[in-house]
Amino acid sequence: LLRIAATLLPQNDPDFDLKSGPVAYWWLELDGIEGRREIGFDDRGDIVRFAPIGANRGVFVGEELAPHHLNESLTSQEFEQAWERALAGWRR
């Protein structure tokens, strides 16, 4: 299963796969059970990928793939601040 996921990720996030390290945790913006936006952080808390942007579809965006065992909630303001930080650092 992990090998399958590893082969799918490059198709979903072509701009990030060669440039970023592994994702330790995700922040997901959900519309019901469907992923709307996602931000992936490394183990230091740095943003290593986010979607959707450009050719990067993401892992959870537009799919009913959001994990059923979500942990803590965050405010929309916290998510938006992280999203803006990701956009500010976005380089193609």
PLM feature segments, named:
Residues 29-59:
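Compositionally biased, intrinsically disordered low-complexity regions enriched for acidic
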Residues 24, 30, 79-83:
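Broad hydrophobic/π-residue packing in well-ordered secondary structure
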Residues 5-6, 13, 34, 69, ...:
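Generic low-complexity, intrinsically disordered sequence content enriched
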Residues 1-5, 28, 35, 71-73:
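Generic preference for hydrophobic/aromatic residues in regular secondary structure cores
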Residues 51-92:
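Short, compact, well-ordered microdomains
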Residues 1-25:
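Negatively charged, low-complexity tracts enriched in Asp/Glu with abundant Ser/Thr
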Residues 14-16, 25-27, 45, 60, ...:
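Residue-level detector of functional hotspots within protein domains
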